[in-house]
Amino acid sequence: WEIIRADKRMCGGFVWEWCDHAVTAGTSEDGRPIYLYGGDHDEQIHDGNFCVDGLVSPDRIPHSGLAELKNVQRPARVVAYDQDKGLLTIVNELDHTDLSQHLSISYEVRRDGAIVEHGDLDLNEPVPPHATTTLRCEPRIPESGRCHLLVTYRLARPEPLLTTGHILGFDEVPLHNSDARHQRAVELAHRPVGNQPLSVSRTATRIDVDTRDLHCSFDVRTGLPVSLVHRGSEFLDRPAELNIWRAPTDNDRHIRLEWERAHYHQATARAYAVDVSEEPGHVTISAEVAVVAPTVQPVLRGHLTWTITDSDVLSLNLRLQRTLGFPSLPRLGLRLFLPESMNQVDYCGMGPQESYVDKHRASYHGFFNATVADLHQDYIRPQENGSHADCNEVTISDSDRSLTALALCPFSFNASHYTQEELVAQKRNTDLTPSGSTVLCLDAAMAGIGSNSCGPTLRPKYQVKNHELEMDLHLLLTTF
């Protein structure tokens, strides 16, 4: 679209596939339709699920891609905002309709996801097709916090199938202020610690750290937690992992071969020279680490540090270098296996649709809540799905406890009842078996989605190919 708009001779943006092309074959035990695709009829020549790539399912249930398309093709678009002068410039993208006769415009200012001001913009003058107009928009901008201006376009009068006020699309503009950091992350990062020593014990394979309410156990072979217990409540079903793998998407079909040749799907963390430092009010565990897989040299090398404070905060500092010669990474992050009952998700970042570095046109910055099941995108062929980009905060909870991840540097997260290994193993969504845990991935980096099933390779700026990779994250455990 950037190319199309830059040159009047260009056209494009046409929908490649409206619906998933798949054949219904009854229903699953839980009542969902079972769909067949290429190869399911024992035919020798077929395209697999190549045509299961629509904007809607075979029974016309919208996929997230349809929401993306809707907002990409919105009727109006912000082309400039002068925050100092309070002037918002909007272009009419319609070919035949005056914008002022078609829609109304409202705005919201969001600070760290929360709405702090809202109002309507005056669209009184005619705006002919493809013309621009400048509107006055002078909200009060908070001096601190990550702030965004959300401009929403709504239908001004009823039309067939649509009612007045129907959302036609939106634009989001980042706002500048004196301190654009997420303030809750700032508060947690600077939370004062006491001066009481923490209890530390060590064996050949474990390091145990105890505060008044929190017990942490780390595996010295990985440098990662194997148990986190707060007031008697265990938060980990399985040991934590450093994670560079994802269930390949349809568009990963070519790069997947390189990923598997590099054994990314088998890569795990290994720690060397683990040290413990005890100070009043906190304990630091540091280790030289690598991400390694069988038969190949380490994919990543670097340093990992955990800091545990007497205020029950665990802080992770991860600094890694990617070994030259390896392909770009699918992702880099921390994978936690929480109890399945922890299925409520509250997050501050891009939502409510799934979002990736190159797929986020249907999302905006806000504070959202959902269940783990709500976040799953039920593609017929299971694959990576449901990530949310540019987040500073996510809380996973049940009625008894919560785990909150906070960071000043934005991260992506994914919460699912399915492991990435299960998504890879199954041919169709109705064959998936829940893991019995809530699988929480906290990612410092996540590769884009792209269009390499039949289009060009993923653009370099959307690849995880930096030599230096890092992650800073705070985990706060709470019981009720």
Which residue stretches match the model-derived regions?
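Conserved, mostly hydrophobic/aromatic
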Residues: 13, 69, 90, 151, ...
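Extracellular/periplasmic ectodomains of large secreted or surface enzymes and adhesion receptors
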Residues: 43-47, 57-60, 64-67, 73-77, ...
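Hydrophobic core residues within well-ordered beta-strands of beta-rich domains
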Residues: 84-86, 103, 147, 314, ...
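Short, hydrophobic/aromatic beta-strand segments
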Residues: 97-105, 118-119, 326-333
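Extracellular and select intracellular beta-sandwich modules with Ser/Thr-enriched
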Residues: 117-119, 166-171
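Beta-strand/loop-rich accessory regions of lumenal/periplasmic or secreted enzymes
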Residues: 138-145, 159, 174-480
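Extended substrate-binding grooves/exosites of carbohydrate-active enzymes
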Residues: 1-89, 93-101, 106-115
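Intrinsically disordered, low-complexity Pro/Gly/Ser/Thr-rich segments with frequent PxxP/GP/PP motifs
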Residues: 103, 108-158
